[in-house]
Amino acid sequence: MSDTFQRIAPEQVRQLRENGAQVVDIRDPQSFAVGHISGSRHIDNHSVADFIAAADLDAPLVVVCYHGNSSQSAAAYFIQQGFSDVYSLDGGFELWRSVYPADTSSGEAE
């Protein structure tokens, strides 16, 4: 089990997603509704405990925020909670949207 997360580029996130990684978006609900990485899950302080309880701690987890800053703190938190393979998207959703505009969705979290 690793005790640190890795910062990765959008291209690496795309590859991890193709191999079944879970992507979580920690931005505010309004920003998530306007646009997010297709297939990502919105989590916040109210839903994080349920997410952790149901998650596969050994599966790769990618954390996304606005620009890649807040996701680093959240990634470190997930490591502390027992996740073994955690990544932070460098550049955040803003960079993802500029690199992969067709691989974004809109709508509220389920």
Curated annotation (Swiss-Prot):
<keyword id="KW-0808">Transferase</keyword>
<dbReference type="InterPro" id="IPR023695">
    <property type="entry name" value="Thiosulf_sulfurTrfase"/>
</dbReference>
<feature type="domain" description="Rhodanese">
    <location>
        <begin position="17"/>
        <end position="105"/>
    </location>
</feature>
<dbReference type="InterPro" id="IPR001763">
    <property type="entry name" value="Rhodanese-like_dom"/>
</dbReference>
<dbReference type="Pfam" id="PF00581">
    <property type="entry name" value="Rhodanese"/>
</dbReference>
<dbReference type="GO" id="GO:0005737">
    <property type="term" value="C:cytoplasm"/>
</dbReference>
<dbReference type="InterPro" id="IPR050229">
    <property type="entry name" value="GlpE_sulfurtransferase"/>
</dbReference>
<dbReference type="InterPro" id="IPR036873">
    <property type="entry name" value="Rhodanese-like_dom_sf"/>
</dbReference>
<dbReference type="GO" id="GO:0004792">
    <property type="term" value="F:thiosulfate-cyanide sulfurtransferase activity"/>
</dbReference>
<comment type="similarity">
    <text>Belongs to the GlpE family.</text>
</comment>
<dbReference type="GO" id="GO:0006071">
    <property type="term" value="P:glycerol metabolic process"/>
</dbReference>
<comment type="function">
    <text>Transferase that catalyzes the transfer of sulfur from thiosulfate to thiophilic acceptors such as cyanide or dithiols. May function in a CysM-independent thiosulfate assimilation pathway by catalyzing the conversion of thiosulfate to sulfite, which can then be used for L-cysteine biosynthesis.</text>
</comment>
<protein>
    <recommendedName>
        <fullName>Thiosulfate sulfurtransferase GlpE</fullName>
        <ecNumber>2.8.1.1</ecNumber>
    </recommendedName>
</protein>
<keyword id="KW-0963">Cytoplasm</keyword>
<feature type="active site" description="Cysteine persulfide intermediate">
    <location>
        <position position="65"/>
    </location>
</feature>
